[in-house]
Amino acid sequence: MQDSDSELEYATQYRSVFDELRNVMPHGTFPQPQVGGDAPTSPTWEVLPALPTDVFGAVAHLLRVSGTIGWFEPSSAGLGSDDSIFLSAEERIDLEELAKAWRTDGESEGVQDLWTELLSHKDACLRPRLLCQEGRGQGSLDWCKVAFKLILTADMAAEGLGRPLGGDEERVNVMRDLLSAKNQPDRGGQDEKTIAGSSLRRRHRHPASMTERIDTDVVCVLPKGRIAQVGCTLRSLSANLALLPPRATVRCQWAEPVAPLRHDDRATLDILLIPAPFEIQGIDFEEVPSSNGGAARDWGNFSLKQSWIEDPSLLEDITIKLIRQAKKQTKSLNAIIFPEYALDWGVFGKICDAAWRDAPELEFIISGSSNNCDQHEGNHVLTALRHEKSGRDNRPWISAVSRRKHHRWRLDARQVSDYALASALKPTVACWWESHKIMTPELYFHRFRQSSTFVTMICEDLARSDPCHEIIRSVGPNLVFALLMDGPQLPGRWGARYASSLADDPGCSVMTLTSWGLIRRVNQSGKYPPSRAIALWKDETGSVEQIMMPPGDGPAGVLVSLAGKDTTDRTIDGRCVSNWSWRFHGQQPILLNQAENHPRHRLMGLGLRACLSSMLSTR
């Protein structure tokens, strides 16, 4: 194939290395002093950025926009060629030594030499294809090779940031300590404040990027967990740092507890799943009137009325009793998860207060919600995390954060029929869209143990690849929890398919969870074989586990036991990294005993008429 005319006009029609460096670091690589109170002097790019994350972000951006990863030869064997980027085994060892000196002693002289060499190619064309074409006078792939040396060095200098190094290196990791200090929440000089109406404290935001000089409206950089074991991308090249999109695309944060992290151990991670609501009425789905009056259209908007929490004390009471039953099955209850839209902030706060009184060992509680702690309505996920003793009071404390759903649920005519909602949502309307504000998408990665990080998705966030799938693949959390308002969680349905994609790349363990109330509506429609699958587990081994609602229609839960396993991830340049993978190790039904499952509780699972009928039949 012949090159296009635009490519032949190479002398004036390409962006240079420096064009993109200046784009991603518009204020230079080093803070410029002010002279006599005047404006700072002109920015400079000759000095190596102080943080490996800045070097990584700048160089990874160069490699991404230039498409250079496809020209990199992963193997250190062989001789290389003029049309490939090759690093010998000796060169790779030298880079490891440079990174170790930078990481442990802050010594960066050798890295500065590489940075200076990169800038010597500042006028070079970004595109490897043009560089390799003969007779163009465009030079060679020299800048690309230097860029790969820099990105590997910066990535190795950040070891210990997302997972522990262990041994002596962990104790002398000055770069890890410096970067962790840069990731502290922006408190504005204030401690976390208790949220009105609960004992939970509002958690301040962590920075969107662990960088100083990078323009976060261009790229962001955060730590990394699992490494993709398939494909040839920048994601599979880095072991410790992740290149992310601009903060306005998705505002991400890497959140860590204030106090030291708990060690990963061989004990199970025991999670109580509570698939509330246990009953959903058809009239809980309500049409939202159109703002354009009576104009004809083939779509509509709907909202959900949470009739199941009209008496919030009922769900609180059930939750505490399920916790007590679960604690009869495990020495340590580690987490509680509710599905999408199960609670609101008020109920969530009260459940958290009561749950931590009964089970102080809990590490986190997650739930879908119709609002957040500021009473902003929408489709939210609420996350409460326990922090060990720290601060002035030297007591454990609980923080809370929230984010909005990234998409809107669309119900088509088939789904309206499947969920038996035709009386509430006209089946003649082609599609019904969930009504809620999205605003700036956010994604929070919660590091809850030394080698373990989780992220939570809300229904369509899992089903739609934009905007967060690429980010999750880059950061590689060990655990992904997907809160759904959906039917049965079957291996052949959409939840399992999209969970498989994240289990394959980058190796996340994924658990979906839906409400028993919506499954009951599907079962009662008679269109499909009845199912009690409220949750589904998928991990990198290909293992698929269906998690079943216990027998009966009353409120119940399931205790899921996960266990960590040492695993080795490998980058495409051959570096081996010790990592942590969570595997499924069983489920146990959690039922209220006969004395606790009185008619008031059964109202949530049977409905008023069925419950009254049951009561009369026992007289």
What are these language model-derived features?
Residues 72-301, 318, 339:
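Long, charge-dense tracts
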